[in-house]
Amino acid sequence: MSAATALYLYGVTWADAARPQAGAGVHEESVEAVPYRELAGLTSAVESTKVPAKRRDLLRHAEVLGTALVHGTVLPLRFGVVFENSTTLVEDFLLPRYAELVQLLRKFEGRVELSVKAYFREEAILAEVVHANPRIARLREATRAASDTSTYPLRVELGERVAAELQERTLRDRQVLLDRLSRLAVDVQVDQEPIEHQVLGASFLVDRERVAAFDDAMNKLAQEQAPRMHFKYLGPLAPHSFVGLSAEAG
């Protein structure tokens, strides 16, 4: 791009694992490596040091890292990291952070991130709660046909009891899932603020040779829990949740 004035940085990999990616990057620019000793920054040209977080470019950022992961270990950076040129990338980041980056690449060698999200099926879990708790069943029946005004206290109690039961089941089932999956992982990061009806949101750092076993465990869980839960399972991914790498000079 003739108007390009800056370099967008996706992540860092070993120089001998870096591969060009034609037209794969943000703004459909080609991804090229900027080497420094054993390291390489994965970059593409951009017009400005500010890159808006548009959906297509967020996807391209993830896809570039995913392709790089096929060829070797990669340390991902968050979306939007831009350097003025290859010289500043080396002098302000790769050189001063060299020892740290090498250490991180060695730490994450042969490891990938797998993302698991589990959600209750709303109708199924509510039916389960009603069936398991006679008081909730009676309250539900008592408030079903009556007016809101006349049964207001009962409705409040019903809501509180259902919420408490759902919370108890969420915590219990979350631990069951974690116990089954974490034994296959090197490390786990659990989302601290799950959304409604979410049982688990977690990222697992897994050795590549154990990914197949993790896949099998996920398939078994999905089959066992199919009547009451559904899952979203992504990976292998670059280890975003575990690297925590910023682009500030060190």
What are the residue ranges of the model-derived segments?
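An interfacial alpha-helical scaffold signature
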Residues: 1-250
